[in-house]
């Protein structure tokens, strides 16, 4: 792809989010979602491999079907304005169809199966964009829908996603699939945060992006698609091993790392609102997902291969950008942020 064209797609994706955020009408929401989808599709096939083409076709089919349901839901809701006594019923049906379409576009459970297959076929860079920035348009729509009567349904989708994301990643040895299930779990927390308040959702999303981008960048440099390949790539990179292991622990929300701060913010809000059931389900999903985070971190930090023990080979150095190093060091500041936030006046 020409370097002069790729910024155009990036700007278009940003404009799609601005269009959704600045309008409360379903037509402009639909236009914003589809504008972002069309701008993102060329990025998916950046390296032109057969797996990327297959993943792009799957992504396009799912997004097109969800877009059709979204548009149909908007028309059903609009038709209720002209049908007198059934106005409320038609409006509720239309809102439900719109919500299901957005949930499918985001990949929330139980409409999450396409996310795993698509991410598995992508390179790490477009996969990172899919699991981070491409969630913003859908989350912006859900934030506006949460002000209606759909908040309880969105809470249910969020809790189910947190559990499915934890359970689905338990037996995975493919790093891309593991990251996909991790994203589904975090997406559940994100949706619950959007229901609790747009500021909480934005805070959690920012933390997730800050934690995810360095991990995707390191995995892209190592080109490790399988846990065994990852171990081989890390064998002569001790600094990279520690940083990657700490990054996964932080992404799992384990104290005292940075990722714990985001979950602590949401849990304190729900406990304050006496939503203990939601808190228990989210914590359960996180504890389950911690199993595969710990497995990867153990592989990165603790396990030493026989070649490392028996041979005196020099360690191979891999350069890290200053920004990435700073973001990974930030992972260690979780408890300091929690302590500082606790001292703030209520």
UniProtKB/Swiss-Prot annotation:
Q: Does the keyword Manganese apply?
A: no
* InterPro entries the UniProt entry points to: Complex_I_Subunit_2, NADH_UbQ_OxRdtase_chain2, ND/Mrp_TM
What is one GO biological process annotated to this record? mitochondrial electron transport, NADH to ubiquinone
Q: Which UniProt keywords apply?
A: Electron transport, Membrane, Mitochondrion, Mitochondrion inner membrane, NAD, Respiratory chain, Translocase, Transmembrane, Transmembrane helix, Transport, Ubiquinone
Q: Where in the cell is it found?
A: Mitochondrion inner membrane
User: How does the entry describe its membrane topology?
Assistant: Multi-pass membrane protein
Main location per UniProt?
Answer: mitochondrion
Domain of life of the organism encoding this protein:
Eukaryota
User: What GO molecular function annotation could you give as one example from this UniProt entry?
Assistant: NADH dehydrogenase (ubiquinone) activity
GO CC aspect terms:
mitochondrial inner membrane; respiratory chain complex I
Q: Does Transmembrane appear among the keywords?
A: yes
Q: Which residues cross the membrane?
A: 1-21, 26-46, 60-80, 96-116, 122-142, 151-171, 178-198, 199-219, 242-262, 274-294, 320-340
Q: What class of enzyme is it?
A: translocase
| EC number(s) stated in the UniProt entry for this protein | 7.1.1.2
Q: Which reaction does it catalyse?
A: a ubiquinone + NADH + 5 H(+)(in) = a ubiquinol + NAD(+) + 4 H(+)(out)
Similarity comment: family membership: Belongs to the complex I subunit 2 family.
Q: What does this protein do?
A: Core subunit of the mitochondrial membrane respiratory chain NADH dehydrogenase (Complex I) that is believed to belong to the minimal assembly required for catalysis. Complex I functions in the transfer of electrons from NADH to the respiratory chain. The immediate electron acceptor for the enzyme is believed to be ubiquinone.
- State the protein's name: NADH-ubiquinone oxidoreductase chain 2
| Annotated source species | Branchiostoma floridae
Q: What is the lineage of its organism?
A: Eukaryota, Metazoa, Chordata, Cephalochordata, Leptocardii
């Amino acid at each position: 792809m020409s370097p002069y064209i790729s910024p155009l797609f990036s700007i278009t994706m940003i404009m799609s989010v601005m269009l959704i955020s600045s309008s409360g009408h379903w037509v402009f929401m639909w236009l914003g979602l589809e504008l972002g989808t069309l701008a993102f599709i060329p990025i998916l096939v950046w390296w032109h491999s057969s797996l990327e083409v297959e993943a792009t076709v799957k992504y396009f089919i799912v997004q097109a079907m969800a877009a059709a349901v979204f548009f149909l839901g908007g028309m059903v809701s609009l038709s209720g304005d002209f049908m007198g006594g059934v106005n409320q019923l038609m409006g509720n049906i239309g809102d439900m169809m719109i919500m299901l379409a957005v949930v499918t576009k985001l990949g929330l459970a139980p409409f999450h199966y396409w996310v795993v297959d698509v991410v598995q076929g992508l390179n790490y860079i477009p996969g990172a964009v899919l699991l981070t920035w491409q969630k913003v348009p859908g989350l912006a729509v859900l934030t506006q829908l949460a002000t209606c009567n759909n908040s309880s349904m969105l809470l249910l989708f969020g809790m189910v996603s947190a559990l499915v994301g934890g359970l689905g990643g338990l037996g995975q040895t493919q790093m891309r699939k593991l990251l996909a299930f991790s994203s589904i779990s975090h997406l559940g927390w994100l949706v619950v945060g959007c229901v609790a308040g747009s500021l909480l959702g934005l805070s959690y999303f920012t933390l997730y992006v800050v934690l995810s981008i360095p991990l995707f960048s390191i995995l892209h440099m190592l080109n490790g698609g399988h846990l065994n390949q990852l171990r081989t790539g890390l064998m002569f990179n001790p600094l990279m091993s520690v940083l990657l292991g700490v990054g996964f622990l932080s992404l799992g929300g384990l104290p005292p790392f940075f990722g714990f701060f985001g979950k602590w913010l949401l849990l304190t809000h729900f406990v304050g609102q006496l939503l203990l059931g939601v808190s228990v389900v989210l914590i359960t999903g996180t504890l389950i997902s911690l199993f595969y985070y710990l497995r990867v971190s153990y592989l990165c930090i603790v396990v030493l291969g026989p070649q490392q023990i028996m041979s005196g080979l020099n360690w191979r150095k891999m350069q890290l950008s200053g920004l990435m190093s700073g973001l990974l060091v930030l992972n260690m500041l979780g408890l300091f942020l929690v302590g500082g936030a606790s001292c703030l006046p209520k």
